[in-house]
């Protein structure tokens, strides 16, 4: 029985046609037809990238149009359809062997070929009922060929490049394939297998192994470094996010919704009303209280390097500001600074923040992102757990004020064992890694396997470890409602956004 196949540009699963990705450089500058000399105006709506052994760069907007049997009888293997920024569609004939590159906006030949294909298909089968394209379009005057072609293009311009495909390896079941596109460049010549860039859910038992293999493939690509200034790669689905808009989307992956790590400065900028942020104790820096000895790098030098790298003085930023007009005291930990580890300065800054909020009767927010106590400061770092907890007790129990703890990924160690879990309301981000001891430490200490996902926010939520799980883009609104519910209102009602 003949099986229907969906052809991606007549060649995705056909290794003998991989050379057609060479179209890339010739079409990079396609604008309104007539401009084939590489215009600076990026006129292609979006990119469809290459998977193959070719050394060429990306193929621009080569759209998948039809899924009919015998498609090769309908259109040449070297003919593609593209769309420019004006929404006009053109057929492109490309022959890499004979160095032929032709662009045509006259669809007469294309329509004729398609009509001939339908007629021949009808004659061969002897029944038009076997060809739904024939039935729908050959005799129904409501449809014009132009509308049909445009409709086909629109149906396949999927921003996620998610297409139902039939695996060329055989089988009767259709599967959803997710084609992970990346920018192909001249440097990408190590990818030898086109199917290695396709993640499929067809075989769930091999998903973990394929994910690890895919992660290795992506991490080995030089392109990740070359285009790091343009794209941010998701840790979960390995998809690419445009860096220019990534922060405005709260560092949430557009492909899968995964929450990537976020700097303390970005959190403050996106959470606190503009012009209201007033930092506290930002000149407080760490010293080497126990003269920690390290064969690799002295503690002071390591602090200096992180200060230069992050632009911060320590692993937490504290201050006061307004959230939708409501005055608050907030501390935001930054995992980029020595893993957000809690040393004496971190503990002192958070303690002073809570004491200030106690005196001013302000609600407190602490955003946790930490690997735990800082080992370079020994017992002094452990003392910060008790010091912060003591200040929090006076704030919450004696003054009856509101403390909201926000757990982000990761929140572990001494932070989890102290102020991270002391909030009147404890909020977690989706998929946040929350634990006291990490998975590796537990497995090495107890010689037991820690199940995957047992330290994720969703699992711990069902165990009652915290209150709600709130997506990052909704957090500001949720906090505003919580504060008003507990009697903290905007200083100016007009400032509510």
UniProtKB/Swiss-Prot annotation:
Reactions this protein catalyses: N(6)-carboxybiotinyl-L-lysyl-[protein] + acetyl-CoA = N(6)-biotinyl-L-lysyl-[protein] + malonyl-CoA
InterPro entries: AcCoA_carboxyl_beta, Acetyl_CoA_COase_Trfase_b_su, ClpP/crotonase-like_dom_sf, COA_CT_N
Residues noted as binding Zn(2+) in the record, renumbered to the chain: 234, 237, 253, 256
Enzyme Commission number, as recorded: 2.1.3.15
Keywords, ordered alphabetically: ATP-binding, Chloroplast, Fatty acid biosynthesis, Fatty acid metabolism, Lipid biosynthesis, Lipid metabolism, Metal-binding, Nucleotide-binding, Plastid, Transferase, Zinc, Zinc-finger
GO cellular component: acetyl-CoA carboxylase complex; chloroplast stroma
Pathway assignment: Lipid metabolism; malonyl-CoA biosynthesis; malonyl-CoA from acetyl-CoA: step 1/1
Biological-process GO terms, alphabetical: fatty acid biosynthetic process; malonyl-CoA biosynthetic process
SUPFAM superfamilies with a match to the protein in the record: ClpP/crotonase
Zinc fingers, C4-type class: 234-256
Subcellular location field: Plastid, Chloroplast stroma
Family from the record: Belongs to the AccD/PCCB family.
Its job: Component of the acetyl coenzyme A carboxylase (ACC) complex. Biotin carboxylase (BC) catalyzes the carboxylation of biotin on its carrier protein (BCCP) and then the CO(2) group is transferred by the transcarboxylase to acetyl-CoA to form malonyl-CoA.
Subunit relationships: Acetyl-CoA carboxylase is a heterohexamer composed of biotin carboxyl carrier protein, biotin carboxylase and 2 subunits each of ACCase subunit alpha and ACCase plastid-coded subunit beta (accD).
NCBIfam families per record: accD
Protein name: Acetyl-coenzyme A carboxylase carboxyl transferase subunit beta, chloroplastic
Naturally occurring in which organism (per UniProt): Nandina domestica
Species classification: Eukaryota, Viridiplantae, Streptophyta, Embryophyta, Tracheophyta
Gene: accD
